[in-house]
Swiss-Prot record:
Keyword ATP-binding carried by entry: no
Physiological role: Cysteine desulfurases mobilize the sulfur from L-cysteine to yield L-alanine, an essential step in sulfur metabolism for biosynthesis of a variety of sulfur-containing biomolecules. Component of the suf operon, which is activated and required under specific conditions such as oxidative stress and iron limitation. Acts as a potent selenocysteine lyase in vitro, that mobilizes selenium from L-selenocysteine. Selenocysteine lyase activity is however unsure in vivo.
EC identifiers of the protein: 2.8.1.7, 4.4.1.16
InterPro entries xrefs: Aminotrans_V_dom, Aminotrans_V_PyrdxlP_BS, Cys_dSase_SufS, PyrdxlP-dep_Trfase, PyrdxlP-dep_Trfase_major, PyrdxlP-dep_Trfase_small
PROSITE patterns: AA_TRANSFER_CLASS_5
Name assigned to this protein: Cysteine desulfurase
Source organism of the structure: Escherichia coli (strain ATCC 8739 / DSM 1576 / NBRC 3972 / NCIMB 8545 / WDCM 00012 / Crooks)
Gene Ontology biological process terms from the UniProt entry: cysteine metabolic process
Family: Belongs to the class-V pyridoxal-phosphate-dependent aminotransferase family. Csd subfamily.
Pathway linked to the protein: Cofactor biosynthesis; iron-sulfur cluster biosynthesis
Major localisation: cytoplasm
HAMAP family: SufS_aminotrans_5
Coiled-coil intervals: none
Length: 406
């Protein structure tokens, strides 16, 4: 099918509103994407006419809600090409998924003297859980350093591995720089050293196809809200053999087989033993609608459109005086920048006055900010509903700010 950005934009109600008397240019989808009417309506319809608690309910509404929820698990498994739907755990988002791995697999497999490898470009969600695990067990956290162009110093990676390396935890795409890491070679190297690999896919799954079997990663995690779905829902993929060995990290209803005050508790099988309590069923069903929406458009079509838009944006931004861009020329989704010596908050505030929404701050990547010796950056992110005209408005806005502030 031919990708039509105008038709896509018509599906997103919020894109028709104004901000400060001007049409909204929403360039903040890397933080959280807007939702198409199809997602909003599907979740609302569930709450209006189909809501019930899932699992163990004998009545019709409960059985139907359970079936819908489990169908989304199957749908998500196809979306990332997992071998089985039972390799997928519903989580609140990428952060919870990584914490689940750290507290379940990590507590069982990482010991004093072991080490975990991350990179200098990671989001805090892929740093802090590993820092906490290492502190608990006496393990070492090793870091792949950055190059100035926003790529990793991959030549250092072989020197970081040894017989005590248990995990490589790496982002698929940097949320600040847009760098897409060469996962295939990194995963192969990790497996050659007997280490497992966790991939933070929060900034990847909306931009192009992801095939977890082809990647051969052990864990892959992403959030629904960045994929045009609801907040509070995400997916953790774990290879089946690993998942079956992992102990639960939260206790409660739905994750048990038996509970006895005298004989203790036994767990149900994976993935359900990692889904304690009442799930976010509405969010899960909304995620299913988002997956259906994106799949119907075609991720290859989306990728082609977004890459053309990114190339246009980078070329047009060259006309802005005193603009510093961070990250490689070949990138996905995001453009981080600073304008002269002006603080990112000031630049972002001016852009907001022009109806342009960008993200400002450290972007949950303070080690990366420290590497570039800046307290903050502005970040414009480009999604499938953004346009060349919105890029032009961003460029014009930055030129105007430069004239005003010098």
């Amino acid at each position: 099918m031919t990708f039509s950005v105008d038709k896509v934009r018509a599906d997103f109600p919020v894109l028709s509103r104004e901000v400060n008397g001007l049409p909204l240019a929403y360039l903040d989808s890397a933080a959280s994407a807007q939702k198409p009417g199809q997602v909003i309506d599907t979740e609302a319809e569930f709450y209006r006419h189909g809501y019930a608690a899932v699992h163990r309910g004998i009545h019709t509404l409960s059985a139907q809600a359970t079936e819908k929820m489990e169908n989304v698990r199957k749908q998500a498994s196809l979306f990332i090409n997992a071998r089985s739907a039972e390799e997928l755990v519903f989580v609140r988002g990428t952060t919870e998924g990584i914490n689940l791995v750290a507290n379940s697999w990590g507590n069982s497999n990482v010991r004093a003297g072991d080490n975990i490898i991350i990179s200098q470009m990671e989001h805090h969600a892929n740093i802090v859980p590993w820092q906490m695990l290492c502190a608990r067990v006496g393990a070492e956290l090793r870091v792949i350093p950055l190059n100035p162009d926003g790529t990793l110093q991959l030549e250092t990676l072989p020197t970081l591995f040894d017989e005590k390396t248990r995990l490589l935890a790496i982002t698929h795409v940097s949320n600040v720089l847009g760098t897409e890491n060469p996962l295939a070679e990194m995963i192969t190297l990790a497996h050659q050293h007997g280490a497992k690999v966790l991939v933070d896919g929060a900034q990847a799954v909306m931009h192009h196809l992801v095939d977890v079997q082809a990647l051969d990663c052990d864990f892959y995690v992403f959030s629904g809200h960045k994929l045009y779905g609801p907040t509070g829902i995400g997916i953790l993929y774990v290879k089946e053999a690993l998942l079956q060995e992992m102990p639960p990290w939260e206790g409660g209803g739905s994750m048990i087989a038996t509970v006895s005050l005298s004989e203790g508790t036994t767990w149900t099988k994976a993935p359900w033993r990692f889904e304690a309590g009442t799930p976010n069923t509405g969010g899960i069903i909304g995620l299913g609608a988002a997956l259906e929406y994106v799949s119907a458009l075609g991720l290859n079509n989306i990728a082609e459109y977004e890459q053309n838009l990114m190339h246009y944006a980078l070329s047009q931004l060259e006309s802005v005086p005193d603009l510093t861009l961070y990250g490689p020329q070949n990138r996905l989704g995001v453009i981080a920048f600073n304008l002269g010596k002006h603080h990112a908050y000031d630049v972002g505030s001016f852009l907001d006055n022009y109806g342009i929404a960008v993200r400002t701050g450290h972007h949950c990547a303070m080690p990366l900010m420290a590497y570039y010796n800046v307290p903050a950056m502005c970040r414009a992110s480009l999604a499938m509903y953004n346009t060349h005209e919105e890029v032009d408005r961003l460029v014009t806005g930055l030129q105007r700010i430069h004239r005003l502030l010098g």
